[in-house]
């Protein structure tokens, strides 16, 4: 039985926890919250550190030096991070759901995730090039498969 099936999120080692991240990059997108409805909207404006092809942070280990507001996702706060997409492995496991069939822990690489359209690859712009963030609202980050 795989570690994510036999352990709770809080029982996982830091290496196991980190490996749960599929690297889709959706959590690195700028998001907006409607002041009146409190509805969350994703944009295609990506963090300046996000590599648009590999969908990985270019400075993950020292990202807070560049982006102090970057959020650390932990077993303790994952339930509060309602802005994480439904496809996020952390959110799925916290809700008692299984990893999706395209997850790199199941497939051995990010290829299936990219082919399934579940990553930011080829869909984003650098946040520094965005003038009116409202013009960049997108729905595709909300997509969830199996």
Curated annotation (Swiss-Prot):
InterPro entries named among the record's database cross-references: Puta_zinc/iron-chelating_dom, UCP006173
HAMAP family registered for this protein in UniProt: UPF0260
Family to which this protein belongs: Belongs to the UPF0260 family.
Protein name stated in the entry: UPF0260 protein SO_2573
């Amino acid at each position: 039985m795989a570690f994510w099936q036999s352990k709770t999120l809080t029982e996982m080692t830091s290496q196991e926890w980190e490996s749960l991240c599929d690297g889709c990059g959706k959590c690195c997108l700028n998001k907006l919250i409607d002041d009146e409805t409190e509805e969350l909207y994703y944009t295609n404006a990506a963090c300046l550190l996000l590599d648009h092809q590999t969908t990985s942070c270019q400075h993950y280990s020292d990202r807070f030096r560049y982006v102090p507001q970057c959020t650390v996702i932990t077993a303790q706060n994952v339930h509060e991070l309602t802005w994480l997409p439904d496809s996020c492995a952390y959110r799925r496991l916290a809700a008692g759901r299984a990893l999706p069939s395209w997850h790199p822990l199941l497939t051995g690489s990010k290829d299936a995730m990219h082919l399934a359209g579940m990553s930011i690859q080829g869909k984003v712009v650098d946040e520094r090039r965005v003038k009116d963030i409202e013009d960049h609202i997108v729905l595709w980050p909300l997509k969830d498969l199996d």
